[in-house]
A protein has these predicted regions:
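Short, surface-exposed acidic
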Residues: 1-2, 20-28, 33-37, 205, ...
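Conserved residues at beta->alpha junctions
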Residues: 3, 106, 126, 150-151, ...
Length: 315
């Protein structure tokens, strides 16, 4: 569900204190803010209000979008005892019940609202923050298949790459749904899931969902897009960068398959690409060993967990 906060500085404050809640309780809950003169005012004013509900069904905070053109456009509850944006996903209380085989991870709460209204009850959002280890642990309780559907601007592309890096050694099967840019007055502008559904409809989104790339294909395409593969120097640079990605893949079969595809893209033999990946793999192992040695020599670092990649064995 959703609601709205009135265009008032103290409507919630007056209502809640009238019902017996103290100002300190409202402050602790992130519903009011203290000013410099010692007074208090409502945090959320003239906003569309979206309750954030945890997987147990409890309201733990709020997301919001301004109704007029004032700033900030989006605002969430501040960190509280019950609400930590690193540890919660908007819409997961509903998406955990989906019959679909995967969960769609979006950027914004309104993306989730629109997708659910369109029949995609497997959509969640990361509350305006980059995907965190804590959120992936939460997701792993309900699915092993993720579809990343971030905005198609530069920030969204960067968020996708960071999420893929975080999920690289996880047990998730990860795909990327790339939303096309929208042509308006001769210029291409960004588009999010909310925009796309409203303009193109659920069937068009379903087609994009079915055609989602896996995470490795997406990252390889991003790397290839940086280089003119008709130029020899660019091809060499591409091979060096893509080999680092391929060397990070956990499975030998997976490395073999994508090494062949990278070789084809670069116009070289699979054997030459394989040698480049092997060199990158050896450099990667050497870097990890040096990092472990530095950690062992530093007492403070030695206290940190040695395994930094994502694992779910203890969940």
């Amino acid at each position: 569900g959703m609601g709205a906060s009135p265009d008032s500085w103290d409507a919630l404050l007056r209502t809640m204190t009238g019902r017996g809640y103290t100002k300190q309780e409202l402050l602790t809950a992130g519903l009011i803010v203290a000013n410099k003169s010692g007074g208090f005012y409502d945090k959320f004013r003239n906003r569309l209000m979206l309750p954030v509900i945890d997987t147990r069904g409890d309201v733990v905070g709020f997301g919001s979008r301004v109704i007029d053109n004032s700033e900030p456009k989006y605002m969430n509850t501040t960190e509280t005892i019950t609400y930590s944006k690193r540890r919660i996903l908007y819409g997961l209380n509903l998406a955990k019940k989906t019959k679909r085989p995967n969960i769609i991870l979006c950027e914004g709460n309104l993306d989730v609202v629109t997708l659910h209204q369109a029949g995609f009850d497997n959509a969640v959002a990361s509350m305006g923050t980059a995907l965190t280890v804590e959120q992936t642990r939460l997701l792993s309780r309900f699915t092993k298949e993720l579809v990343l559907c971030y905005d198609n601007d530069n920030a969204g592309q960067l968020a996708t790459q960071r999420a893929l890096e975080l999920l690289n050694n996880s047990e998730f099967s990860v795909k990327v749904l790339q939303l096309p840019r929208r042509l308006v007055d001769g210029e291409y502008i960004k588009q999010d899931a909310d925009d796309f559904i409203k303009l193109q409809g659920p069937d068009a989104f379903e087609r994009l969902l079915n055609g989602s790339e896996n995470g490795v294909e997406f990252r390889m395409a991003q790397i290839a897009g940086k280089y003119d593969l008709k130029d020899d120097e660019a091809r060499i640079a591409y091979c060096g960068e893509v080999s680092e990605l391929l060397a990070s893949l956990p499975g030998a079969v997976e490395r073999e398959i994508y090494t062949g595809r990278a070789a084809e893209a670069a116009g070289i033999t699979a054997e030459a690409m394989k040698l480049e990946v092997q060199r990158s793999f050896k450099r990667r192992i050497a870097r990890e060993k040096r990092a472990e040695l530095r950690k062992d020599l530093n007492p403070a670092m030695a206290l940190q967990p040695k395994e930094r990649s994502l694992r779910f064995e203890n969940m």
